[in-house]
A protein has these predicted regions:
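Mature-chain termini and adjacent capping regions
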Residues: 1-181
């Protein structure tokens, strides 16, 4: 086989492989990405509440009553919030602990739970107790939710049997788009 003919066969094989790979990639369903993926946990945090108590020696502030937190496109609403911070130089918020009807909202999702922790250093939001994650008309119910703000990945666990309404299992309801059948 001549060198020229061998090169033509290699180019044709590569072209066919490329077309096959493209067709396979287009056939794969696109996974929805959370609006919280890549959330800037270094953005300023704004907190409003009915009452605040600052415990400077303990490097924490406690907010109570209609607490509303915003950071970029993320909002958190709750009844009570403890803000842990470090005060070496300037104040840097490390963690938010929320209790009492915690609701975390992004442009496309809403997550609810009894208690919540937002670890700004690890870029994780954890909700526990009667957890519900809603996106559009779809929702998932469980006992614990962890949202990784780096990847946008959300993991929901069911918890021990008999503890949660879902009987220890995760329960989901997903809407299906009309396919014009």
């Amino acid at each position: 086989m001549s060198i020229m003919r061998r090169r033509i066969l290699i180019v044709c094989a590569a072209a066919c492989a490329g077309v096959g790979a493209l067709a396979h990639a287009q056939a794969q369903p696109q996974q929805p990405v959370s609006a919280l993926k890549g959330h800037n946990s270094n953005a300023p945090v704004d907190v409003t509440a009915d009452r605040i108590e600052v415990q400077d020696r303990a490097d924490r502030a406690m907010f109570a009553g209609n607490v509303h937190v915003t950071q970029a496109e993320l909002t958190l609403d709750t009844e009570r919030l403890t803000v842990a911070y470090s005060s070496a130089g300037s104040i840097q918020i490390d963690r938010l602990d929320a209790s009492g009807g915690v609701v975390v909202t992004s442009p496309s999702e809403t997550a609810r739970g009894d208690f919540g922790v937002y670890d700004l250093n690890r870029k994780l939001i954890t909700l526990v107790g009667n957890v519900r994650l809603t996106r559009g008309d779809s929702n998932i119910i469980g006992s614990r939710l962890v949202i990784d703000l780096n990847s946008g990945r959300a993991v929901i666990a069911g918890g021990p049997a008999g503890v949660a309404q879902s009987g220890g299992r995760v329960k989901g309801h997903f809407t299906v788009p009309n396919r014009g059948d």
